[in-house]
Amino acid sequence: MMRKLKTLPPTLRDKNRYIAFEIISDGDFTKDEVKELIWKSSLEVLGETGTAIVKPWLIKFDPNTKTGIVRCDREYVEYLRFALMLVSEFNGKRLIIRTLGVSGTIKRLKRKFLAKYGWK
């Protein structure tokens, strides 16, 4: 009989922060393109080691409003914001990624920063 692994207590879990962002561009983007954009910009600016430390992860993206949520490590929020800020072009489309805000929970992030874009 296999034993079930115990879950980590909250004191040992990774502390995450969630960043709300908006893509300002004439072109449209899919969730997969945004995921690739975040990874490529993070790798270019921070390198492989830095990206592994920051742990960027796209949680949700709405292609209609071009807004989304990305998760990262609590200690390295500014590194990811910096990496996203430097993006100016992707797949031949000019764009700007604007950070709307940072929060410790997705619920609070939606309520505070993404409510005006129709997120619930």
UniProtKB/Swiss-Prot annotation:
Keyword Nuclease tagged: yes
Main location group: cytoplasm
Highest taxon above the source species: Archaea
Gene Ontology biological process: tRNA 5'-leader removal
Subcellular localization, as worded in the UniProt entry: Cytoplasm
PANTHER family xref list: RIBONUCLEASE P PROTEIN SUBUNIT P14, RIBONUCLEASE P_MRP PROTEIN SUBUNIT POP5
Family assignment from sequence similarity: Belongs to the eukaryotic/archaeal RNase P protein component 2 family.
Descriptive protein name: Ribonuclease P protein component 2
